[in-house]
Amino acid sequence: MYVEIIDVRAREVLDSRGNPTVEVEVLLEDGSFGSAIVPSGASTGKFEALELRDGDKKRYMGKGVLKAVEHVNEIIAPRVVGLNAFDQVYLDKVLLELDGTENKSKLGANAILGVSMAVARAASESAGVPLYKYLGGANAKILPVPFMNVINGGAHADNSLDIQEFMLVPAGAPSFKEALRYGAEVFHTLKKILKDAGHVTAVGDEGGFAPNLSSNEEAIQVLIEAIKKAGYEPGKDIYIALDCAASEFYNEETGKYNIDGTEKTGDELIEYYSMLIDKYWPVIISIEDPFEQEDWDSYVKFTQKVGGKVQIVGDDLYVTNVKRLEKGIELFASNSILIKLNQIGSVTETLDAIEMAKTAGMTNVISHRSGETEDTFIADLAVATNAGMIKTGSLSRSERIAKYNRLLRIEEELGDAAIYKGLGAFYSIKR
């Protein structure tokens, strides 16, 4: 198919934290329309593509994105108008060449990604198929197991927990719809437990609670209690996943990790995680970013030790970048990768990373950012790529729920063709 792009425009809008971000709208010659809003992270990897901010302290504390908007309207739009909306690979190649830098620092990854996503949306509308079918073809049918971030710590909360996310993983549910119900029921049960214990139950950036618990281990214990009280079996119906975001508690001067009030070497941290896995076996199923983003040695040792039974996810380690992923595959540094569109900055590069990981036998976890919007692109992306897993926040805050509701609609639309793999989605480990 060949349908020309006839108009591209961007504007500054707000994300879920009240910070500016880029929205892009694309119009095609047949009247088809697509729009996209770019998300933004709080704990960002140092190797991520650059999110361009204005730096004008008098406006949005320097976080405005008028430069990125201008780059779309003045530089990108004239170059992509007239291109075929159905040639996503060529479109993204043009965008990368237009920028010409390794980390998209000239035009901004937020400018490039907004256009890339909006064109994909417009093309799917022109083709008369949902976005997941357009990106993934006729075989796009696997609904992802949700990773629900219900207890927040680290950079996502002002509390005593070092580990950034404690997540519910309802891999024992028979369908996505039921998985969502399992998670919601535990979320409400958890709220009551925390409230009864005298904790504040206001929610953080991703919709989870941020209680001042005594230790990271107590957070795991409270989650297990909530799972049981909600009527489910931990390690069978619902599992627990951790996002340690260890770069945030790594001390560059000492080369050690500050966790639970003590300093640990990489080897000592491996023992700490191994203790948690064994003590709560088989409940902990996935650990993300257990080490600092350049501590390849600890990743390799940890994967050798527990990678057969626990999913070890590289986020800051890989930043959805095929060059870093290649190194990880070569070293066998992890058995899974977190996928974030805005870490790399285009749809094609994101799909390339997913494909490379799959070919290497690694799992893919499609992910949101802490600064999100009402955009549901990642829900379609998860189904399009049959990734089998998605991480998109807690069971509150409508920018998180928007993705879950989109997945409910997709599951309903697919009907009997829909597959929820549950534990089978974790194909890089044996359980």
Curated annotation (Swiss-Prot):
It is found in: Cytoplasm; Secreted; Cell surface. Binds a second Mg(2+) ion via substrate during catalysis. Its cofactor is Mg(2+). One of its GO terms (molecular function) is magnesium ion binding. Pathway: Carbohydrate degradation; glycolysis; pyruvate from D-glyceraldehyde 3-phosphate: step 4/5. The keyword Magnesium applies. One of its GO terms (cellular component) is extracellular region. Signal peptide: none annotated. Mg(2+) binds at residues 243, 288, 315. Its EC number is 4.2.1.11. The keyword Cytoplasm applies. It catalyses: (2R)-2-phosphoglycerate = phosphoenolpyruvate + H2O. Keywords: Cytoplasm, Glycolysis, Lyase, Magnesium, Metal-binding, Secreted. (2R)-2-phosphoglycerate binds at residues 164, 340, 369-370, 391. GO terms for biological process: glycolytic process. Pfam families: Enolase_C, Enolase_N. The active site is at 206 (proton donor), 340 (proton acceptor). InterPro entries: Enolase, Enolase-like_C_sf, Enolase-like_N, Enolase_C, Enolase_CS, Enolase_N. NCBIfam families: eno (TIGR01060). HAMAP family: Enolase. Catalyzes the reversible conversion of 2-phosphoglycerate (2-PG) into phosphoenolpyruvate (PEP). It is essential for the degradation of carbohydrates via glycolysis. PANTHER family: ENOLASE (PTHR11902:SF1). Belongs to the enolase family. This is Enolase. It comes from Fervidobacterium nodosum (strain ATCC 35602 / DSM 5306 / Rt17-B1).
